[in-house]
């Protein structure tokens, strides 16, 4: 491993062994063979971690490793799940063959998220080989059913609560080093998620109306009233929109790298916030989602008596705003004879990480050092991660995978032809090594 090319291939061949494990997770049942195969591969690839770490298996295949530190009262947590989604469609290379071609390793899980997991294990293994003493306890957690929000992370959370374990910081998947998220930036961006949108599933019910057919609105069927309600919500977009601290932080971090006139706008948020709130939803759906609650309607059906049922899947950023958004939604629904039913267990909200927290600042500084060619910025993640289960265990829950990917690789997550450039593997390992080596 004397040249970068040799190191690229070395890591690529080792990661390929993990990709060849078909660890597809299903709600319907657990098929252990490929998961046990991956466990054996990890044991072979990382013998020092296997020897020196305390390993606990949670549930059917979530695993938790602990390497003790010089200060036994402090802890940090690395995370990446090892389950993957099915690999349907037409692929250039078989999705579980682990083929290296054209400088890329092809296969399901190369981006989401066996590469980050491999980089975490590799960093631990290499630091142990160097004789490095970790300053604090280092935990590595990997769940087996993240892809369908299974119980792996919940079991880990219960374990940490039971053993009174809190963390200085937690690092999971989320952002990455990607192409600029908006026009006018001429360099790659290391996007670090410090918050992810909460999720709420509300039941919508439009029952048959009683009364004379000549009364106002009585001629509308439950389906018609449900459709009218959905249409009004979609057209009026009634939810609160604001520049949340995480979004302001993103704009402030990216503004120096923008071209004129975008730099002027994003460097003066006090003057232009109103304009941005109006324009962002027009840029793209993801930009609009960063401003507040998002709503998707689904699963519309009818009962034998004509009652129409549906669901509203709501994704919120701020819990106080969301409470007001729900009131607005209920009032709109009442006007159409639609009732909203919401149970406490159907509503999840996750505490954001402050941009001033020591943990975020440390991860940001590490990313700036390891990826000097990239602009480093926070953002709000619209998708879900295992990390959301742990926001009560740390003041700094960071969602960032140190993988440098292009647009095709980014789009391949849960799609066809997922792949990773093997020349980007060393820097991912180096990120975790620096994150652990310099922390005190």
What kind of region is each of these model predictions?
Residues 2-110, 127-134:
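Acidic/His- and Gly-rich active-site-bordering loop/insert found
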Residues 54-56, 71-73, 178-180, 187, ...:
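An extended, acidic, His-containing surface patch that forms the Zn2+-binding/catalytic region
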Residues 73, 93, 135, 166, ...:
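Short, solvent-exposed loop/turn segments at the edges of secondary structure
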Residues 82-83, 233-238, 330-338:
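A common structural junction motif
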Residues 104-105, 111-191:
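Acidic/histidine-rich catalytic neighborhood of metal-dependent amide-processing enzymes
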Residues 154-155, 159, 213-238:
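A short core secondary-structure module
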Residues 174-175, 190-203, 400, 404-410:
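Flexible glycine/proline-rich, aromatic-decorated loop/lid segments
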Residues 186-188, 207-213:
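Flexible glycine/proline-enriched surface loops and loop-helix/loop-strand junctions
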């Amino acid at each position: 491993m004397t040249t970068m090319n040799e190191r690229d291939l070395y890591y690529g061949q080792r990661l390929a062994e993990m990709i060849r494990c078909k660890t597809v997770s299903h709600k319907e049942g657990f098929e252990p063979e490929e998961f046990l195969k991956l466990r054996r591969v990890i044991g072979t690839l990382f013998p020092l971690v296997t020897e020196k770490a305390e390993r606990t298996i949670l549930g059917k295949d979530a695993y938790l490793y602990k390497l003790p530190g010089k200060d036994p009262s402090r802890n940090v947590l690395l995370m990446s799940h090892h389950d993957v989604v099915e690999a349907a469609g037409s692929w250039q290379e078989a999705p579980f063959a682990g083929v290296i071609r054209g400088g890329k390793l092809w296969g399901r899980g190369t981006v989401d998220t066996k590469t980050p997991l491999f980089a975490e294990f590799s960093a631990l293994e290499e630091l142990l080989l160097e004789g490095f003493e970790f300053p604090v306890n280092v935990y590595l957690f990997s769940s087996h059913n993240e892809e369908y929000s299974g119980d792996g992370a919940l079991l880990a959370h219960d374990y940490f609560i039971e053993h009174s374990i809190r963390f200085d910081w937690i690092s999971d998947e989320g952002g990455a080093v990607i192409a600029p998220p908006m026009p006018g930036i001429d360099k790659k961006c290391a996007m670090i998620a410090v918050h992810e949108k909460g999720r709420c599933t509300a039941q919508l019910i439009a029952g048959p109306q009683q009364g004379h057919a000549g009364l106002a609105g009585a001629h509308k069927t439950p389906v018609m009233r449900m459709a009218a309600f959905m249409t009004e919500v979609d057209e009026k977009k009634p939810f609160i929109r604001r520049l949340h601290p995480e979004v302001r932080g993103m704009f402030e971090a990216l503004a120096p790298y923008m071209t004129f006139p975008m730099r002027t706008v994003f460097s003066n948020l006090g003057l232009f916030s109103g304009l941005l709130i109006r324009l962002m939803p027009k840029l793209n759906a993801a930009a609009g989602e960063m401003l507040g609650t998002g709503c998707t309607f689904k699963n519309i059906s009818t009962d034998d008596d004509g009652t129409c049922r549906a669901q509203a899947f709501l994704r919120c950023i701020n819990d106080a705003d969301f409470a007001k958004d729900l009131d607005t939604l209920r009032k709109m629904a009442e006007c159409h004879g639609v009732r909203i039913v919401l149970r406490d267990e159907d509503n999840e909200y996750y505490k954001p990480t402050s941009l001033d927290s020591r943990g975020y600042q440390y991860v940001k500084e590490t990313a700036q050092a390891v990826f000097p060619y990239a602009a480093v910025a926070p953002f709000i993640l619209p998708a879900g991660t295992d990390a959301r289960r742990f926001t009560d265990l740390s003041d700094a829950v960071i969602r960032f995978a140190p993988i440098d990917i292009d647009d095709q690789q980014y789009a391949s997550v849960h799609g066809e032809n997922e792949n990773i450039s093997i020349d980007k593997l060393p820097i991912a390992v180096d990120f975790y090594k620096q994150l652990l080596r310099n922390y005190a």
